């Protein structure tokens, strides 16, 4: 029986291949709308088709496994604008990204506020939050928010579908 202050080793310590990490827990989320306003005109655009996107989210510490957020989304066609567009998911993740905004914010905060180098920050995210982020990805996120980039990624993208 473990008591307070006893060392309990991380069962994943020493694993060198991503394939050997625990299998992720899948959580399903739907953004499938039958109709939504067009990006330019605001008229109702019916659902044209649908899709699915998998995002890496912060892990579940109770089960000690990573979490993959499987997002079902709808694609629409506006007859007035004559444009195809997907439902806006920028509140969950940046366009084209594989990680949720929560993971990106936490990774940047660990490096900037806590002063951790990129490699230890990657291990910290896995050990404490059960999300695997390569250290080079963290470096890209941090540098994109600094003076080299044009600022952090946009939270709300204007002109989606243009």
Predicted regions and their residues:
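Short, conserved DNA-binding cores of transcription-related domains
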Residues: 1-83, 87-90
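Short, positively charged, Gly/Tyr-enriched micro-motifs
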Residues: 59-161
